Regions:
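C-terminal accessory module of base-excision DNA glycosylases/AP lyases that mediates lesion recognition
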Residues: 1-22, 116, 120-203
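N-terminal polyanion-binding entry modules of DNA glycosylases/AP lyases
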Residues: 1-94, 98
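Short, amphipathic alpha-helical segments that act as regulatory/interfacial helices
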Residues: 42, 46, 59-63, 102-109, ...
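Short helix-capping/linker segments at secondary-structure and domain boundaries
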Residues: 48-54, 108-116, 177-178
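Short acidic/histidine-centered micro-motifs embedded in hydrophobic/aromatic stretches
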Residues: 58-61, 77, 104, 156, ...
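Alpha-helical ds-nucleic-acid-binding substructure associated with the helix-hairpin-helix region
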Residues: 67-144
Length: 203
C-alpha cells in the first residue's frame, strides 16, 4: 500500500524509482573509506537549509580545501588553519558548518579506535532493524548530524535506511502509526517497527 501511495504521489512507478537512491551491499559499505563518509556528512550539513545545487557546484573546491577529507590530516589541523579555511571564497563561508569537518573527523576516529575496525565496517555491521540507533549515534557523537541530515547522508552513501521526509511523516500520521513529535524516541521507535514489519512482509 505504501509503495502504491508513493507511486501515486510522485507521478508513477518510473518517476518514483528515478528518485530513489540506490542502496549498496554491506561489502561495499565496509570498503568505503572514512574520507567518503566524512565527505558526505559534510556535504549534507552544508546542503541543510541551503540551495543544494550551489553546494554541488562548489563541491570539487570543498574536496580540495579539505584535502579530500583525509581524516588523519584533518585531525591535526590547528584552530587558526580551520578559521582560514572557513574564510576561503572557494567554499561556502559558514564557520559553524566548517567546524563540523574536524569535529566529525574526530567522531569517525573515536569510533574506529573504540570499535577496533573501520568506520565503514561499523556502519555495515549496524542491524537493519535498528537504523534509528545509527541515526541517534550520529546525532549524539557527531556534529550537526541530527534531524534528517545524518539519515540523508547515510542513504546517499548507499545505506538501506528509511527517511522521515514530509511525505513519509504525513503517511505515518494519517495511519496513526505516529502521534507525537517525529523526532521523539516514541515516534522513531514506532516508525522503525513499521518499516521492520514492511521488510518482513516484502521478504
Amino acid at each position: 500500500y505504501l509503495y502504491d501511495h508513493a507511486c501515486e504521489r510522485k507521478g508513477g512507478e518510473k518517476a518514483l524509482k528515478a528518485l530513489l537512491p540506490k542502496t549498496k551491499s554491506k561489502a561495499h559499505l565496509k570498503k568505503l573509506g572514512s574520507d567518503r563518509y566524512l565527505a558526505e556528512f559534510t556535504r549534507k550539513i552544508f546542503q541543510s537549509g541551503f540551495v543544494w545545487r550551489v553546494v554541488d557546484k562548489k563541491w570539487p573546491q570543498f574536496e580540495e580545501v579539505f584535502w579530500e577529507f583525509d581524516v588523519e590530516r584533518l585531525l591535526m589541523m590547528p584552530d587558526d588553519m580551520l578559521e582560514r579555511k572557513a574564510k576561503d571564497p572557494a567554499i561556502i563561508r559558514n564557520f559553524s558548518k566548517v567546524k563540523t569537518v574536524r569535529e566529525n573527523a574526530m567522531m569517525i576516529d573515536d569510533t574506529e579506535r573504540r570499535e577496533q575496525q573501520s568506520f565503514g565496517e561499523c556502519v555495515a555491521a549496524w542491524p537493519n532493524d535498528d537504523m534509528i540507533g545509527l541515526w541517534l549515534y550520529l546525532k549524539k557523537h557527531g556534529s550537526r548530524l541530527g534531524g534528517n541530515t545524518g539519515p540523508f547522508a547515510l542513504r546517499t552513501l548507499g545505506v538501506d535506511t528509511f527517511l522521515l521526509t514530509q511525505d513519509v511523516e504525513g503517511f505515518l500520521r494519517s495511519h496513526d502509526i505516529v502521534d507525537s513529535g517525529i523526532t521523539s524516541q516514541r515516534a522513531l521507535k514506532a516508525a522503525q517497527t513499521y518499516f521492520n514489519d514492511l521488510r518482513e512482509q516484502s521478504g
